[in-house]
Regions:
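Catalytic domains of riboflavin
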Residues: 1-185
Length: 185
């Protein structure tokens, strides 16, 4: 997986509230103190007998495919695990302008099950005396870095702003653009 090479190591799987409820994925904590309001649920692995530790790229990919399977049941997942599902707001980026909601909106627009996979990309740093050099963004890749990464690897890159603009153009104005929470994940 490209993500396991260039990300922070934390792979998340945005899902709709309906999927989270169907698969019995409760919030990780009762009182969410995340500054961006990211709705982390309990972590999962696939319950498929082929899964070993759950940490391999194959095991994590299977957990993500299970979350996106419309036929999946709660018993198809083990808890805790190595993938963290994130519960999107019902209104998508119309309600919260975060990566979680954008992922679910992209899946919906593609005609797919509203469950995706995201990971925070990190800036490449030099290792000096065993310590990674970190940029001013705590090593996290921001907009310009993501655009460069996309060009380097031949990947299409779309910003949340691009998605909002597209939705306004094709589905009408957002109900309350100013009221939408500006999230991160």
């Amino acid at each position: 997986m490209l993500t396991t090479t260039f990300d922070s190591g934390l792979i998340c799987a945005p899902v709709t509230p309906e999927i989270a409820n169907k698969l019995q994925l409760p919030q990780m904590v009762i009182e969410n103190a995340d500054p961006k309001g990211t709705a982390y649920t309990v972590s999962v692995d696939s319950a498929d007998p082929s899964v070993t530790t759950g940490i391999s790229a194959q095991d994590r990919a299977l957990a993500c495919r299970t979350l996106a399977n419309p036929s999946a049941q709660p018993s198809d997942l083990r808890r805790p695990g190595h993938i963290i599902p994130l519960q999107a707001k019902s209104g998508g980026v119309r309600e919260r302008k975060g990566h979680t909601e954008a992922t679910v909106d992209f899946c919906r627009l593609a005609g797919k099950q509203p469950a995706g996979v995201i990971a925070e990309l990190v800036e490449e740093g030099e290792v000096v005396e065993g310590v990674a050099e970190i940029s001013g963004n705590n090593g996290m890749m921001r907009r310009d870095g993501c655009l460069r990464f996309g060009r380097k690897w031949g990947l299409k890159v779309c910003t949340i702003e691009d998605l909002v603009e597209y939705l306004e153009r094709t589905e009408g104005p957002l109900a309350s653009t100013a009221a939408a929470v500006n999230g991160k994940h």
